[in-house]
A protein has these predicted regions:
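N-terminal maturation segment of proteins
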Residues: 17-426
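Bacterial N-terminal signal peptides
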Residues: 5-13
């Protein structure tokens, strides 16, 4: 109770810094929302969530301006927002305007991409997500592969040995729904100890097939979300809490709830929409990935999996520590995704070489590597948000203090006010 009271007090303090809407800035924010909706008419999937006035979407879809017209509108809008930022003496207004200007700049570059423009991988990430990813040489991951080799002794290729080891921890398809739902429920219970949510908030689970992603959260507004989990490939027991925390609590569902709160309670119109490609990406995906270690610090993840999820899945809890050790080591390979994506998208290697490198450095089977290559084809530099975004959020939370309560307060502060990646850097 003390923890949630402290966090509630923090939220009130943060929200007190959110000034009453500036009329001029709200007018420009509306223009940004309408611009984004019209971009969505040119690119399916650009608008990830929208819960503003229905007539704005209807108008945008019925009569979208051309991409050339939208570019001119974005340039003019960006200049107007920057003028407000320069003229205002209020810290909260300047922060909001600075954040909104970055959103518009990202949308402007996305329009160039819709028209066929391409930039080198790192520059594309900077222009879309306002974050510079750290790209390490693939050789930096060779020591991690050596550690994993020691964890999974035997003969043959390391990727094959890892696949055989992980196959022991696959959740049977007929138990997947129950296991993932149990994980979601526990992620929610732990999140509610630190973050207040509306009574009507709800998060439902649907199993689907045929997508390049493994899971996706659709935030529908009014504090309601649906997570879709793709079942084309088997899910391992260590995926369950990742799904529950990343897509749900304290990840995308909670992020959506707090963004909608900025819109409805504080009239920050720009938060009525969530474009897929925007500077919110590193914060949302990084925050989602950080959700597991935030909700299950230290050994708590392993303890819950052993006591609750392994029995539900019909797996032996005594084998959980070995699986956890391998999963922890494999997490240290995550940055290799960015290096491979950069080499592939910048034309240094072809798709077949990218798939081979994904198999080698992420220890994936051919089918899973092919699926991830499809994800890179579809979302391009978006992949940085999972890795660089996690580093960003984790670093910010750790600098807030050594204890878990401090990390929760830091995370809540990110959700409760306009925030750009640069705001979270040292």
């Amino acid at each position: 109770m003390r923890a949630i009271a402290a966090v509630a007090a923090l939220a009130m303090a943060l929200m007190s810094c959110v000034t009453k809407p500036a009329p001029d800035l709200n007018r420009l924010a509306e223009s940004y929302v309408r611009l984004s909706l019209e971009i969505g008419a040119h690119e399916d999937g650009y608008v990830d969530a929208y819960y503003g006035p229905a007539e704005w979407r209807t108008q945008a879809m019925a009569h979208p301006r051309s991409t050339a017209e939208l570019k001119r509108a974005a340039d003019a809008l960006h200049a107007q927002i920057e003028a407000i930022e320069s003229a205002s003496a209020e810290t909260a207004v300047k922060r909001r305007a600075h954040t909104l200007a970055a959103y518009v700049a990202s949308a402007r570059f996305r329009l160039d991409m819709i028209d066929g423009a391409r930039a080198p991988f790192v520059q594309e990430a900077q222009l879309l997500f306002a974050l510079t990813p750290e790209i390490k040489p693939l050789t930096a991951y060779d020591p991690v592969l050596a550690r994993i080799d020691a964890l999974v002794p035997g003969h043959g290729e390391l990727s094959g040995r890892v696949a055989a080891f992980r196959a022991r921890y696959v959740i049977p398809p007929d138990k997947l729904q129950a296991v993932v739902q149990a994980a979601i429920d526990e992620c929610r219970r732990r999140t509610l100890q630190h973050i207040a949510l509306q009574r009507n908030e709800r998060f439902t689970l649907l199993l689907v097939t045929g997508h390049s992603w493994g899971a996706y959260n659709y935030y529908h507004g009014d504090n309601q979300s649906q997570i879709q989990v793709d079942t084309d490939l088997p899910s391992n027991i260590d995926d369950a809490l990742q799904l529950g925390c990343h897509e749900g609590y304290p990840g995308h569902h909670v992020q959506g709830v707090y963004a909608e709160r900025l819109y409805r309670r504080y009239r920050y119109v720009e938060y009525s929409i969530a474009p897929l490609f925007s500077p919110q990406g590193p914060i949302n995906e990084g925050g989602g990935n950080y959700g597991v270690e935030l909700a299950f610090p230290g050994a708590e993840k392993l303890a819950f999996e052993q006591s609750r999820l392994y029995p539900l899945a019909g797996l032996d809890p005594a084998t959980a520590p070995a699986a956890e050790a391998l999963a922890a080591a494999m997490n240290d390979l995550a940055g290799a995704r960015l290096t491979i994506a950069q080499q592939y998208l910048d034309g240094r290697i072809d798709r077949e070489a990218a798939v081979a490198l994904l198999q080698h450095y992420l220890l994936q089977g051919r089918e899973r590597a092919e699926k991830y290559a499809r994800f890179i084809d579809q979302y391009r530099s978006y992949v940085i948000n999972y890795v660089s975004g996690l580093d960003l959020i984790r670093g910010y939370a750790n600098r807030a203090g050594p204890d878990n309560d401090a990390h929760w307060r830091a995370y809540l502060s990110i959700l409760s006010q306009p925030t750009l990646p640069a705001d979270l850097e040292p």
